[in-house]
């Protein structure tokens, strides 16, 4: 009968198994996009994934949108405005933007692509056409840095398009809304001091530049103007190719021209291009251009080694299998050989350096072991604890190895086999005993097989071996009975029986021997035939 300790341990394991089963049913699996889930959880302000899942379930089951407190916009104008923003982004970047989360304003949503480009859209407000805001002029330095090539291609379109482009670039450089001012003439020169100050500000601003960020504000709007010619095609540098100068970069002028096109929508809001400090995604470095001043870009070339190193971030690590080497122990008198450096170091530490031994606590035993796990297995032999029970006959055992060997009795499995005679058994002890028998009788194997050379202890074993292993060769040989000749018996004198009958036995080359028994009163029939 099992002890109370074993029953308590069994009940504890059963309760643990049931608890794991219940937890596995209600466990939340978020899929393989773990980084995106963690980023969304942090942006929404949750500390646990379960809270994020509860929030998403509430959002799904709720009748209205939590983020949109105001009335929903018209289905046509609101969605068309979102399509316009997405189209504006697609002219600069080929990646598809996705919803990142709520923005800073009430009801504002932020969309972001994999390259870090963001733009905000507020569905609660429908843009309406308004007057054109007049803003501060763009400095000559900024013009040269951002729109030099685009302006050269658009000079034929007239002064009106150029003034609109310069006002939008001014908003980009200042990053804040500026008060309304009147635009000066196009060819007006500025003071040298102002140019130097603005050059310094531009270098500070562009040195920390990161991918484009689009944000929309429904306060301003754009007038209906003729569509300018398309902007030059953005060239994506290939691997090992030097990125082009900023003159060939996609210009904000072309983006703003597409916003104000009458075909898409009466541009209800202005799209403000800002330089955000969002870090670039290393895997999408080929989709973004580095924004640098002309002087610094000419002096410093992109570092290809840094791009290769950072491109490996986030990829799954592939572990290489350790090489199999034969490493013998270098201590004198020890011939152990290991295939792993870790095993060799462990062997040296406990067998030679420390020579730590674990003694059995039983006073009558006195055995010691080099490893603690071996001592634990040995201590079970002294106790009456039998935690391993056979499922066929309910017999209990102290160790799992004994249970495995016992279970083979019920299954009939005999995995161990003698390599000499093919004897099979269930446990290693039986095989060792059987091999010892072969070692003792090795000198007595005097009868070899004439076909394969295998030796046996008895001639009967040779005959049994030939009939089992070489049945096709036996018919060509003489039968075993002919190998031993029958003894010849010659009796020249006749044996007289007590009754007077004579018994004569003759043997010749003929295998059939004749034996005659004659009595005195009965004549021999063979003598009668001869006469």
UniProtKB/Swiss-Prot annotation:
Comp. bias regions, Polar residues: 290-303, 483-499
Record's comment on post-translational modification: Phosphorylation at Ser-469 results in loss of DNA-binding activity.
Record-listed Phosphoserine modification sites: 231, 469
Domain of life: Eukaryota
Ranges of Acidic residues composition bias in the record: 186-206
Homology family: Belongs to the krueppel C2H2-type zinc-finger protein family.
Gene Ontology BP terms: regulation of gluconeogenesis
Chain intervals with Low complexity compositional bias: 502-520
A Pfam family of this chain: zf-C2H2
Cellular location(s): Nucleus
SUPFAM superfamilies in the record: beta-beta-alpha zinc fingers
Protein name, per record: Zinc finger protein 692
Cited function: May act as an transcriptional repressor for PCK1 gene expression, in turn may participate in the hepatic gluconeogenesis regulation through the activated AMPK signaling pathway.
Zn finger region (C2H2-type): 327-352, 358-382, 388-410, 416-438, 447-470
Keywords carried by this UniProt record: DNA-binding, Metal-binding, Nucleus, Phosphoprotein, Repeat, Transcription, Transcription regulation, Zinc, Zinc-finger
Principal subcellular localization: nucleus
């Amino acid at each position: 009968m099992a002890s109370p300790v074993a029953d308590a341990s069994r009940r504890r394991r059963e309760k643990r198994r049931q608890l794991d089963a219940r937890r596995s049913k209600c466990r939340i699996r978020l899929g393989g996009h773990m980084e995106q889930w963690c980023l969304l959880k942090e942006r929404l302000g949750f500390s646990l994934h379960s809270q994020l899942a509860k929030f998403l379930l509430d959002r799904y089951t709720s009748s209205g949108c939590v983020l949109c407190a105001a009335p929903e916009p018209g289905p046509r104008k609101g969605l068309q405005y979102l399509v316009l923003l997405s189209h504006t982004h697609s002219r600069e970047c080929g990646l598809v933007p996705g919803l990142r989360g709520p923005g800073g304003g009430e009801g504002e949503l932020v969309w972001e692509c994999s390259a870090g480009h963001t733009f905000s859209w507020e569905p609660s407000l429908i843009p309406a056409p308004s007057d054109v805001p007049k803003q501060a002029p763009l400095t000559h330095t900024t013009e040269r840095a951002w729109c030099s090539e685009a302006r050269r291609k658009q000079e034929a379109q007239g002064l009106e398009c150029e003034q609109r482009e310069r006002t939008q670039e001014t908003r980009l450089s200042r990053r804040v809304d500026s008060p309304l001012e009147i635009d000066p003439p196009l060819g007006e020169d500025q003071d040298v001091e102002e140019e130097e100050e603005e050059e310094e500000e531009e270098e500070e601003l562009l040195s920390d530049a990161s991918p484009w960020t689009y944000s929309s504000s429904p306060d301003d709007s754009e007038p209906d103007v003729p569509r300018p010619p398309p902007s030059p095609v953005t060239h994506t540098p290939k691997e090992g190719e030097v990125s082009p100068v900023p003159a060939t970069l996609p210009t904000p002028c072309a983006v703003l021209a597409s916003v104000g096109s009458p075909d898409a929508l009466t541009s209800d809001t202005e799209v403000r291009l800002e330089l955000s400090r969002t870090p670039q995604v290393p895997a999408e470095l080929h989709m973004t251009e580095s924004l640098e001043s002309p002087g610094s870009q000419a002096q410093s070339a992109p570092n290809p080694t840094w791009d290769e190193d950072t491109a490996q971030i986030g990829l799954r690590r592939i572990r290489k299998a350790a090489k199999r080497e034969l490493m013998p122990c270098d201590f004198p008198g020890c011939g152990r050989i290991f295939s792993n450096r870790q095993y060799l170091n462990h062997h040296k530490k406990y067998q030679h350096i420390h020579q730590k031994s674990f003694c059995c606590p039983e006073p009558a035993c006195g055995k010691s072991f080099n490893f603690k796990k071996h001592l634990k297995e040995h201590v079970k032999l002294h106790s009456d604890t039998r935690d391993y029970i056979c499922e066929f006959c309910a017999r209990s055992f102290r160790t799992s190895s004994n249970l495995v060997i016992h279970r083979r009795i019920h299954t009939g499995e005999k995995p161990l086999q003698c390599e000499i005679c093919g004897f099979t058994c269930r446990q290693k002890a039986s095989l060792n005993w059987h091999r010892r028998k072969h070692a003792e009788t090795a000198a007595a194997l005097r009868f070899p097989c004439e076909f394969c050379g295998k030796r046996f202890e008895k001639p009967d074993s040779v005959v049994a071996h030939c009939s089992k292993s070489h049945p096709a060769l036996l018919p060509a040989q003489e039968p075993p009975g002919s190998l031993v000749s029958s003894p010849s018996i010659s009796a020249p004198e006749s044996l007289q029986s007590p009754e007077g009958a004579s018994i004569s036995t003759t043997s010749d080359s003929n295998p059939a021997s004749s034996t005659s028994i004659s009595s005195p009163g009965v004549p021999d029939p063979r003598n009668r035939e001869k006469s």
